[in-house]
Amino acid sequence: QQLFPQTQAIFLFNAGRSALMLGIKALNLPPGSKILLQAFTCSTVPNAILWNSLTPEYLDIQKEDFNLNPDILPQNPVAKALIVQHTFGQPANMEKITTYCQKKKLYLIEDGAHSLGATYREKKIGSFGDITMLSFGRDKIISSVFGGALLVNNKNLVKPVENLYQSLPYPSFSWTAQQLLHPPITFLSKKTYSFYLGKLILFLSQKTKIISKAIYPKERDQQTPPFFPRRLP
């Protein structure tokens, strides 16, 4: 809350993709509606769109920062929303993108998975969109193995998000145990990796589901794993 004092509400989830999935659902878009996003992205982003029975529409990126190219945004979009990604923590051109969404009356969703703490013209990334997804996965700025948050900046979306959020179950004991075991097992694996033992420890731990994977096989087939979405206490 101190990092984002302007936000209307913050909701915590078991993963960034859970936050994005529920945030998109709260927009209450008609089935099949299109959402604009850049093509260079993690598979979990278009999955969150598809899991809501919506359609991703991919756009090209700029070579210099791997972010969405605002100069090729469609002039007559049929889309209802746009997801802007701040790739590798480099802020996208929020001046052009925000103006575009306001002019075309599109919901603006920020993917802040890489960019917690970044700013664009002295304004924090995450404070531009109607909603913003943050990720606390094992490869993010703040890691809790799995975890995420949804910032709601549009006051009209607070109640829809809250209603959906309260209907979610908490993560199971077994899933939580997997995440708690991840740090000590990966620590042991790294210490013995040069002897090939660490690689075996990591492989067997994931194979036997003692620890979790960052991306699950079901997700690669655009299927929803049973433990997404979940809220945190």
Question: How does the language model describe each region?
Answer:
Residues 1-23, 37-39:
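Short loop-beta-helix segment that forms the pyridoxal 5′-phosphate
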Residues 12, 58-60, 134-135:
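Structural signal for conserved beta-strand scaffold positions within catalytic alpha/beta enzyme cores
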Residues 123-126:
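Short glycine-biased active-site loop of nucleotidyltransferases that positions the nucleotide triphosphate
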Residues 8-9, 31-34, 159:
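Short acidic capping loops at alpha-helix termini that bridge into adjacent secondary structure
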Residues 116-121, 131-146, 151-233:
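Active-site region of PLP-dependent enzymes
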Residues 18, 25-119:
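PLP-dependent aminotransferase-like
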Residues 6, 31, 77-78, 102, ...:
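Residue-level preference for short coil/turn positions at secondary-structure junctions
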